[in-house]
Amino acid sequence: CSIQTFYTDGKISIDKNLKEKLSSIPLDPNKNYHIGSGQSSDSLAVGNREGVLDAQLDFARKNSNIILEFKTKSKNIAHLLKTDIPDNVFVSWSLNPQIFIDHEEHGTASLDQRLSCAKSLSDKGVLVGFHFHPIVYYEGYEDDYKNIVNKVMSMFEPHQIAMISMGTLTFIKPAINKLRSAGLKSKVLQIPMVDAVGKSSYTKEVKAEIFSNVYNEFRAWHNDLFFYLCMEESSIWESVFGDFYKSNVDFETALFESVSSKMKPLEIA
């Protein structure tokens, strides 16, 4: 994953004092926060070693003005299944065709395992979410992603899902250099890309096409779910959704209100 460029020594560490550090964060009680755990790693990769999951769950339990999102590509949900999960916590999975998982997402759970884990937590009453990220453009991608959408819609109801996001392959130069120097077997750097606001990604036209294709497969859920694009320009939002948020604050407010409305006792500050 390109986020490996966030780290310099390649080591994975676990913070033994996470609970204390979280409790020292100065949160404004009059503001709302959407906190994503696993943004540059994987929230469930190490389970509850050193109490890292319990520390985060306790943090969410004590702060009703936050939404805590665990982001993962794993099947490591054993601790969450046997633990009380606060209502303001949800778990999200990245979804991609199995062929992409096999060739690019080494060591992660299969597509069916991810969906099965999401269903297990959903059956427990835990809200789940899905990230179609990165959506990869290749011959036949439409049918592969349509298959994923059909699986999601057959296994879940809209009220069980916090949100669905979409994003594409986007690289900063250090990430490209890191992937090349690592010598990993990957085809992602063979994909034709252009400069996109200082990064390498698909053209705007290709992005609009792939986002629209996936979004339109969810047409029956358009009014019941919060859909958004990951780090895309307003012109692409408008092309896909017919509108865009005028500011990041507007987007964050809309996301928080939509997700929190599906969380039973969560109070909006």
Predicted ranges, named:
Residues 13, 17, 48-51, 106-113, ...:
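Alpha-helix N-cap and loop-to-helix initiation/capping positions
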Residues 21-28, 79-84, 111-124, 214:
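Structured alpha-helical segments in the cores of large, soluble enzyme domains
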Residues 33-37, 68-70, 91-93, 128-132, ...:
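Hydrophobic faces of well-ordered beta-strands that scaffold small-molecule active sites
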Residues 40-44, 75-78, 89-108, 134-139, ...:
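Conserved radical SAM core fold
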Residues 140-155, 237:
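Catalytic cores of alpha/beta
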Residues 153-269:
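Auxiliary Fe-S-binding modules of radical SAM enzymes
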